[in-house]
Amino acid sequence: MRVVAGILYIVVMAICGLGIQGGTLQDYPSVYFQDSTLQQDFPTIFFNILAGETYGDFIADLREIVTRTADTKNGSIPVLLNPAHPVPVRERFVKVHLTGRNGKTVILALDVTNLYVAAFSANNVAYFFRDFSALERENLFSGMLTIRLSFTSNYVSLEHKAGVGRENISLGPTPLDEACTKSLWSGTTVTEASIAKALLVVIQMVSEAARFRHIEERVRRSFTAADHDQLTFRPDGLMLSMENEWPSMSLEVQRSIEGGIFIGVVQLQDESFQPLRVDNFNTLSRYTMVALLLFRCGHPRATAGTSSTTPAAAQIIRMPVDVLAGEEYYDEETCTVGEPTRRISGLDGLCMDVRNESNNDGIPIQLWPCGAQRNQQWTFHTDGTIQSMGKCMTSNGYHPGDYVMIFNCSTAPVPDATKWVVSIDGSITNPHSGLVLTAPQAAQTTILLVVRNTHSAKQGRSVGDDVEPIVTYIVGFKYMCLQGNNENNTRVWLEDCAVDRPQQWWALYSDGTIRVDSDRSLCVTSDGHSSRDAIIILTCDGGINQRLVFNTDGTILNPNAQLVMDVRQSNVALRQIILYQPTGNPNQQWMTMITRTRPSLTS
């Protein structure tokens, strides 16, 4: 007979119930036992610290479990379930078994709606945070002696209890092993400070790595280094700010307007703790490689004859599907729509500029070095217009070669020519004519035209106030880095990453080109636009073979050919990168790893 329908409590003072020596866990408020008949079968995954080479597969499996309900129709970045909507208990948590080098195992219970650690167990004792919920209490680690910790699971509380900030805590295989097999396994005989510090290690190496491919890569490298027992790293400013700002970046992505333009700004820091303002999705993705988003808001359903005013959902993210109703979340969580003002940069990093800072009707729009002047400020309105100084950007007609100017929005000679659509790949298109903004040449004072879309670099644009090229190395198949000779008409290939090697550094321009950092007149180029054509380095010319788009699925796409960069035959020894049809295979996966000061990843 069940003694209690829910949970059987035997509440005693921790110091008495466990016979704990003075100075260890003396501030635990209570100990209780749970009814084992309430045990739920949750999805479970395993990771053995001795098998560090499987770390990438472990993180991939974790992402797959927590995104099983994500819509499969649209973009590539899944949004986690909304905790405000009903989620079957059996699908609410995932159990992660972490086994140390001595065979001891710690089990984490992660909430699938946010990847937070809800509770954990070790050595047949379950530990809950101070702010545990009834859902957690009634369904996790039933039948175990259970201890309630005096702190919560957020970073502020954990760092306060640990007495040390994350920036001063080493991460890597040895810290993870010690966290699991010493501090967490021996939780009843160590201080709460030790438990909190251990959790800071575990959370970053599991939950944060699942949220961000950037963090996953840093951790993975620590596992696969030749001397991994000694190899550790500490979080830098970029990593810490990514962890802190995950909710705000999730909100900005979900409410971003077409082209992934943010309504607000995500305030990050670079690795040296200098401010880094991010106002568009492409920049955010290149810095963080965000892989999962917290649910913040949904997009309104488009009614007959209309389209969503926030189409970024279809271009970037996969919204969760209500596991009970089989529909996407909307209702009261609908995203608010804004009208951000940003700069628009393009060919050779030059900005769109209203000539002579004049707001007279008919003044052409030209390329000009980027600055803070008002005639380079463009506001993206919900009616589809893009305006500067109160005037609409419009073409002089619907014919290829017509120039682009500003004009009074209500009296423009070709009314529908004032409407524009910004694509996530950087094209700005007039939907009536299908023509796109184009810079005929890379020179200041060049007047912009509308022409047929060829997906050339002359037609690539980036909307955002950070107009400087992003310098990065590019990690590909087998976690090796893209490298070139930095000379014209030479091939690129993969080598072991050595971040102090200039041949592995690339500058990402707003026109969609990937340039040699040491000579920015040289561009990564496809030697043709057919499958199996080689990827080489050529002098930049703004052509169709030099525009490359980093997709959220990890591929690098040539939008004209609709082919992606591919390590030929998955064989790095061939030293060939080619264009090929998308297959989803690992030899077509790439990631940017950006650092402004270019230290080693393990520093």
From Swiss-Prot:
Sugar attachment sites: 74, 168, 356, 408, 488
PTM description: The precursor is processed in two chains, A and B, that are linked by a disulfide bond.
2-beta repeats: 520-558
Presence of keyword Disulfide bond: yes
Disulphide-bridged cysteine pairs: 297-335, 351-370, 392-409, 481-497, 523-540
A Pfam family hit: RIP
GO biological process: defense response; negative regulation of translation
EC number(s) reported in the record: 3.2.2.22
Active site, renumbered: 208
Family annotation (SUPFAM superfamilies): Ribosome inactivating proteins (RIP) (SSF56371), Ricin B-like lectins (SSF50370)
SUBUNIT field: Tetramer of four pairs of disulfide bound A-B chains.
Function field: GalNAc-specific agglutinin. Behaves as a type-2 ribosome-inactivating protein. Inhibits mammalian ribosomes. The A chain is responsible for inhibiting protein synthesis through the catalytic inactivation of 60S ribosomal subunits by removing adenine from position 4,324 of 28S rRNA. The B chain binds to cell receptors and probably facilitates the entry into the cell of the A chain; B chains are also responsible for cell agglutination (lectin activity). Involved in plant defense against insects. Has very low cytotoxic activity against the human tumor cell lines CEM and Molt4.
Protein name: Ribosome-inactivating protein PMRIPt
Provenance organism: Polygonatum multiflorum
Lineage: Eukaryota, Viridiplantae, Streptophyta, Embryophyta, Tracheophyta
